[in-house]
Amino acid sequence: MPRRREVPKREILPDPKFGDVDLAKFMNVIMQGGKKAVAERIIYGALDFIEKKNPGKDPLEAFHMAIGNIKPMVEVKSRRVGGANYQVPVEVRPVRRMALAMRWLKEAAKKRGEKSMSLRLANELMEATEGRGGAMKKRDEVHRMAEANKAFSHFRF
């Protein structure tokens, strides 16, 4: 391992409209090629659509609820022991938990069939708040893998 000091985490500024750090982080995940204005338009469009569909319900609350539902608790990591590779279930650190949830949400929204990305994202977010959708399927798949390989949990890292 390198003996240099640990690089400090960069502070992410909250997003301009809602003042939320997690939303700003998700904006950076959605952004492609440094086009933050496009990412902003996609996310704010999705949140506006959620507000139209569910009047009186806070879209930011729906976003946080969806992310909370998608976050994985455990995942599997490959570990080589005596010439065999084992899928060892490990607990996911909180920062990685958030990153995986955002990445899965983006990928699931991309794969949907709606016309615009903001519409896809809005529908994926609404489904995730109800516990269904592509991102939730991905989380359940990861949890199933960890459950199936519970026998190898004594090979901790």
Curated annotation (Swiss-Prot):
The Gene Ontology CC terms held by the record are: small ribosomal subunit
Can you cite a GO biological process for this protein?
translation
One Pfam family, short name: Ribosomal_S7
InterPro entries for this protein: Ribosomal_uS7, Ribosomal_uS7_bac/org-type, Ribosomal_uS7_CS, Ribosomal_uS7_dom, Ribosomal_uS7_dom_sf
Q: Which GO terms describe its molecular function?
A: rRNA binding; structural constituent of ribosome; tRNA binding
Keywords from the named record: Ribonucleoprotein, Ribosomal protein, RNA-binding, rRNA-binding, tRNA-binding
The record, for PANTHER family, names: RIBOSOMAL PROTEIN S7
- Family in the record: Belongs to the universal ribosomal protein uS7 family.
Q: What does this protein do?
A: One of the primary rRNA binding proteins, it binds directly to 16S rRNA where it nucleates assembly of the head domain of the 30S subunit. Is located at the subunit interface close to the decoding center, probably blocks exit of the E-site tRNA.
Q: Subunit info?
A: Part of the 30S ribosomal subunit. Contacts proteins S9 and S11.
What is the protein named?
Small ribosomal subunit protein uS7
> In which organism is this protein found?
Polaromonas sp. (strain JS666 / ATCC BAA-500)
